[in-house]
Amino acid sequence: MNFNLIDINHWSRKPYFEHYLNNVKCTYSMTANIEITDLLYEIKLKNIKFYPTLIYMIATVVNNHKEFRICFDHKGSLGYWDSMNPSYTIFHKENETFSSIWTEYNKSFLRFYSDYLDDIKNYGNIMKFTPKSNEPDNTFSVSSIPWVSFTGFNLNVYNEGTYLIPIFTAGKYFKQENKIFIPISIQVHHAICDGYHASRFINEMQELAFSFQEWLENK
């Protein structure tokens, strides 16, 4: 997958990037509830699992916007991937650990869903941190905490402050006033994403949840 270098000196975001990367190293998270009432009803009728559906939605928004695909490569050069693949957690009740498995993103939901099922079949019961080898560099993290409907979530990433890729976490969905919601948290680096960009992610997730008929059976 192609990694496109960013010319920082001619980048409109340069002063913001340098400020939040070097002067005030800053990451932040935003949590919001996404209504999934009709979506959940529809996928249950079709016997479709919810978790890969949610992962697909997140990956679709990520791949629709360059700011969610910006990072440093292994040489330390800044750039962005043409596309990114989700790496998601699978819980093992037997020993209370989890695995991180990646599936290649596909714009077709049905193809992505099929690939997800194959990966779960092949690797889901292997109790290793990363049971599927050869994870590409162009992945982003998705995790699920389906035991609690949290109202806020924050990860403390201890490094040099150079991890720029967003991290996504979903909680337990819940019912409120005859509607069903799920809390979604996005954690981003302020050098790359402002409140506008994080808000756009939340809003587009909601749009996908409402417009599921346009993509749920997309081949």
Curated annotation (Swiss-Prot):
It comes from the Bacteria. One of its GO terms (biological process) is response to antibiotic. InterPro entries: CAT-like_dom_sf (IPR023213), Chloramphenicol_AcTrfase_AS (IPR018372), Cmp_AcTrfase (IPR001707). GO terms for molecular function: chloramphenicol O-acetyltransferase activity. Keywords: Acyltransferase, Antibiotic resistance, Transferase. Gene3D superfamilies: Chloramphenicol acetyltransferase-like domain. PROSITE patterns: CAT. The active site is at H190. Its EC number is 2.3.1.28. Belongs to the chloramphenicol acetyltransferase family. This enzyme is an effector of chloramphenicol resistance in bacteria. PANTHER family: CHLORAMPHENICOL ACETYLTRANSFERASE, SLR0299 PROTEIN. Homotrimer. This is Chloramphenicol acetyltransferase. It comes from Clostridium butyricum.
